[in-house]
Amino acid sequence: MSSSLPRSLLRLGHRKPLFPRYNTFVNSSVITHTSLLRTRLYSNGTGATSGKKDDKTRNKPKPLWPQVKSASTFTFSGILVIGAVGISAIVIYLILSELFSPSGDTQLFNRAVSMVEKNKDIRSLLQCDDGITGKERLKAYGELITNDKWTRNRPIVSTKKLDKEGRTHHYMRFHVESKKKIALVHLEAKESKQNYQPDFINMYVDVPGEKRYYLIKPKLHPVSNSKGFLGIRWGPRKD
């Protein structure tokens, strides 16, 4: 009994499988192989179609109008930028030359006004209220074009001319005002060969009811008194 019991237990516990094991492995390998073939075929088909579409889009000619439009806009914007930079450079150069150049109207005006303010005779003609504590400050401005009292709306009148030697002459006119009187200042400056600043060659002040006062008198060139026929002296030279 003891020997037959374990055999029966073994018979009951261990049952043979209905299908052999090698069949399951074969079936699984076949399924995986067919699925891989399907995925490869699907991928190859889609890749071919996408490649054909890309080739068509690449080979398709682009329209000409957008290219012309983009090129024209780029050229126009470049011209605008270059023109704006050029105009800005010219304006900056003119402003700097006018304000800081020794031959500019601003520098000439400041020099002339300082000369008028320091002159005692002109201050007496203008009846300035000068005392021990201080001196009256004069107002200097340009032409009275409008009735506006603001000095910034009164521009300075100035002109430039070239002489026979090719040097520039500056002509300027402005007003000087005290509390009691107003004077008109005339200035003539000439380009200097030695200095950066033009030389004042003529400057005078006109006060209403007073005689003209010269701060700088012009140099008169002597005229040779030539006697003789056709302005030529005939005969021996007299030493």
Swiss-Prot record:
Subcellular location: Mitochondrion inner membrane
Other noteworthy facts: Present with 3770 molecules/cell in log phase SD medium.
Residue spans, topological domain Mitochondrial matrix: 71-75
PANTHER family the record matches: MITOCHONDRIAL IMPORT INNER MEMBRANE TRANSLOCASE SUBUNIT TIM21
GO biological process, one term: protein import into mitochondrial matrix
Statement: the UniProt record of this protein carries the keyword Mitochondrion: yes
Record topology, Mitochondrial intermembrane segments: 97-239
Keywords: Membrane, Mitochondrion, Mitochondrion inner membrane, Protein transport, Transit peptide, Translocation, Transmembrane, Transmembrane helix, Transport
Domain of life: Eukaryota
Protein name per the record: Mitochondrial import inner membrane translocase subunit TIM21
Organism: Saccharomyces cerevisiae (strain ATCC 204508 / S288c) (Baker's yeast)
Family label: Belongs to the TIM21 family.
Ranges that cross the membrane: 76-96
Membrane topology: Single-pass membrane protein
Main localization of the protein described in the UniProt heading: mitochondrion
GO cellular component assignments: mitochondrial inner membrane; mitochondrion; TIM23 mitochondrial import inner membrane translocase complex
InterPro entries from the UniProt entry: Tim21, Tim21_IMS_sf
S-S bonds: none
Subunit (UniProt): Component of the TIM23 complex, at least composed of TIM23, TIM17, TIM50 and TIM21. Interacts directly with TIM23. Interacts with TOM22 component of the TOM complex. Released from the TOM23 complex by the PAM complex, leading to protein translocation into the mitochondrial matrix.
Transit peptide, from-to: 1-70
Functional note: Essential component of the TIM23 complex, a complex that mediates the translocation of transit peptide-containing proteins across the mitochondrial inner membrane. Required to keep the TOM and the TIM23 complexes in close contact. At some point, it is released from the TOM23 complex to allow protein translocation into the mitochondrial matrix. In the complex, it acts as an antagonist of TIM50 by reducing preprotein accumulation at the TOM23 complex and promotes dissociation of the PAM complex from the TIM23 complex.
Pfam families referenced in this protein's UniProt entry, alphabetically: TIM21
